[in-house]
Amino acid sequence: MSTPPARRRQLRTWSPAGKQELVQAVTAGSACGPELLDLASNDYLSLCRHPSLIAAAEAQLRCSGVGAGGSRLVSGSRPVHDQLESELAQWLGRDKVLLFPSGFQANLAAVKALANRHTTVVADRLIHHSLLVGVQASGARLRRFVHNDLESLERLMLRCRSEHPDAHLLVITESLFSMEGTSPRVHELATLCERHNASLLLDEAHALGVLGEGGRGLGFGERRVTMLSGTFGKAFGSGGAFLACNGELGEQLLQESGAFRYTTALAPPLAAAALAALELMRNNPDWGHTLVQRSNTWRDRLVEAGWARPTGGGPIVPLLVGEDQRCLNLQRHLELSGLFTAAIRPPTVPEGSARLRLVLHRLLPDETLESLLRALSDGRVS
């Protein structure tokens, strides 16, 4: 094994505790540890335990059973799949939506639909691993631009056009980067792609439900985004994923995508829960905006407490610590203080940039920030 012992990860098992936003570590013998406030999961809108999602999943269990039992093109399609695809397409202003069992599969399918060995992919340096695997599987050439730097992107596009004048260009980025909490200027990026005749794939996994008009992501209303990928495993509080695009690309995915055709369909109860989450988002369009405002208050207070300002402006608040062991020690101290956080270390992030990935949720108690600031202050001293 090439991973240094100090950086080997270990699985920890967690169980939801009695109240919303609380979790407990499960140890050997199924013993549960103390209740901790969850500042680590991607359940941004606090929907994974929402009564409406649970009721929708339970009703679908009684109707369709647990699993789909087949691929969408054989026997796995259910009415709930069709309804979710239709309502998502309407919500996002797209012609076609197709569901996938996981975000990894959706991203793999997206890249392979838009790129081949004649394509040059120009990708943000920090895109998700699933997108990089998709590029590799497509056979396309890969070039990387400086994170969220449009000047770097344009220089690279001009160079690629010079080196391969007839190649198709595909630009790949994310609307909310999971470890930095940062976002690109999507409108300007789309204008750049239009200028250089490039397709644009936008991964909205962490943005949907939180960013953009009514939580519909940063690609909403921007028709120059060729394809959107999204997930139900974060703000939607369920599981699975989807791609949204025009009708022609949607038909291409349906007919040609192995990641769509050769996999068991999304479990119907998860689709039903995602549909219930979508209804809640439509009825509460300010949830995301309120969460973003709260996250910026956290950033301001962390700066006042002597920390470097966490990057970005959404619910992912990366607190830069630097050295690996110091970050782990601080994480353990916060856990002893009743706060569950994630220490993110290389190779997930660059060397010397270990961080606590703090994640805000809609239903976090008002006093959470004060508890965090006290624990961080004590952890620094110790």
Feature-to-residue mapping (PLM):
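PLP-dependent enzyme catalytic core of the Aspartate aminotransferase-like
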Residues: P51, A55, A59, C63, ...
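Conserved N-terminal alpha-helix of the aminotransferase class I/II PLP-enzyme fold
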Residues: I54-S102
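Conserved PLP-anchoring active-site segment centered on the Schiff-base-forming lysine
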Residues: A110-H129, L150
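Conserved PLP-binding catalytic core of the aspartate aminotransferase-like
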Residues: H289-N296, V303-G338, S353, L360-R362
